[in-house]
Amino acid sequence: MAVANRVVSVAIGSDTGGSVRLPAAYTGTVGFKPSYGRISRNGLIPYANSLDTVGIIARNTNDVTALYKILDKHDPADPTSLRPESRARIHEARRKRQVDFGHHYLEGEDTKITFVGSRSNKEIPANDSVPKDKYKRYASGYFRRIGVPDEYNIAEMHPVVRQAWLRTLSMLVDKGHTIVPISLPNTKLALAAYYVLAPAEASSNLAKYDGVRYGTPRNPNTADNENGPLYANYRGQHFGEEVQRRIVLGTFTLSAAAKDNYFIQAQKVRRLVQQDFNNVFAFGHPLLPHTRHQNSSSDQTVDLIIVPTAPTPPPKIQDLQGQSPIQSYINDVFTVPASLAGLPAISIPAAIDEDIPATPDRHVGMQVIGQYGDDLSVLNFTRYDIEGTMNFDEARELTWSRKRM
């Protein structure tokens, strides 16, 4: 809220499953989760070690990029921070990719994407017929192949969000980019896997906050009974209800009776989600040699993926208070897959239908997802091709600077 109300220009926060991107989508700001390990987590209270990422919130992509470039460096104090050798491999992979950047931009099948439940039932050409002599460099580089996953096009999506997604893709087609339908089949399992893995890691990480060596000092007047459990009352007083719920859930999934059926299976799903992304990106994972060049010449691969950040506009407090935990977890359905795969993802305010009044409770965020290590491509594309198309000084009104297509 400090960024949204112009109290500060930028802010940082942890993004484990969408905790930076979702607030940004709900407040009309820009929220960026970099690739896992790019920014040091030193000083951050760990929640889920394999998922926690320091993210950035600002009112525009330029400010996000400026802070990211400052923070993007190895920190010996953080064991999850990318080492210089890994950063060098990523840099070299991106440099080689730039040399061949336009080679796979070929005309493919005349496929179309139809949006479920769209008021206009408008179809977007999946392979744009932009003349080949127009494939030249401009502000953000070459024209891109934009992936639209079929699994994100759900019937439960709010009409306002669907229309914003449709208009965003239409604007990109108008600029010369190619829309490519893709499939991420294991996306439907990602949310369930996340809510097994994250609580399991949290139950381990937060166990140390017992008032003995970590946490606030124990108050003798409220300490556990002499013959009772040592930590129960203390932890109950200092952890919120949702945190306690996740600790209990995580402790159960790590138990001998449940570990094989839940935790191990969730780890397998996570690997499948990562594999799905590697299969569709033209830029192979720079730290996984077997994926580095496997897709570079395929006509069905993409440079970036664009999906909504959340399936609904911002929920109201009174609605959240009446939700069950399961209902609240569903809001993470579009942000969790990128977190499981450790990919860079940014949420940016999107244009809603001009026929629907733009009000504070109708903020919509679009999410741009890139391959691991391709953070700057995500930031530059968002800055020049999406943000540059909008009247961003009036981002809260969510209007485009040009007429509707």
Give, region by region, the residue ranges found by the protein language model.
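Short helix-loop-beta junction
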Residues: 161-178
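Acidic, glycine-rich active-site loops and adjacent beta-strand->loop/helix elements
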Residues: 14-20, 24-26, 152, 212, ...
